[in-house]
Amino acid sequence: MDYAQSRLQARFGERPDDMLWQALEAVPERGVALEVARASGLRRWVAGISADADSHEIEIALRARWRECVTEISSWMPAGWQPATLWTSGLVDLPALCHLARGGRPLPWMFSDPLLQAYARADPMTRGRMLREDCGAFAGSSFAASGNAVLPAAPSPSSIRKAWLEEWRRRWPRWGDTGLLENLALLLDAALKQPAAIGRPELVRRLRSLFRRSVLRPVAAFIYIAFAALDMERLRTGLLKPALARDGIIAS
């Protein structure tokens, strides 16, 4: 874990502070926001995003950078931890999967996303069946039918969240010191279940506390990934606001 810890500490030190976020979010033009991001630790996230990209292109680019981030972090980890690390790439897919499970219409960018396009292109009934089968493949009894009960067309958002967390836990290698990892799992579950109940500042505070206690432990990688997800979400908001205004989706 020495190599992984040194890389994680370096990346953690590059994370934007409040002043940089304020500078990025204060600019009205996305081109300027991209310049601010490229001059900071956010530069990896905005690679490939042009000043004239529309909102859907921005979403696809950020999601691609996210998967690259998780893959890179996984490569730093001991082999036994790589399956669990790679599984976290699905963290940012959960809101989209829950949206589809509620019966929401696929958003335009979903048709271009490597993971979500199969769901987006399916008709509603097939989409629901696909969601249930894919969740059931790794959740086992959580999605099993009891007796002759008729299963709903799609799993509930809470079932998707639970199945994702169960599979993540299943991928943890045998390891005696799982206390901090369990604390992180509970924190992620609470944040995914009720995002408004745990505000961003409180979530960041708790993650920082866990990170300080995780030196040379595998959990440090997962805590950093959680930070990366928060940073991507905030960057997306900063970049999409002018793009959506330009596209006529929100008022400028």
Regions found by a protein language model. Give the residues of each.
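N-terminal domain-start signal
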Residues: 1-252
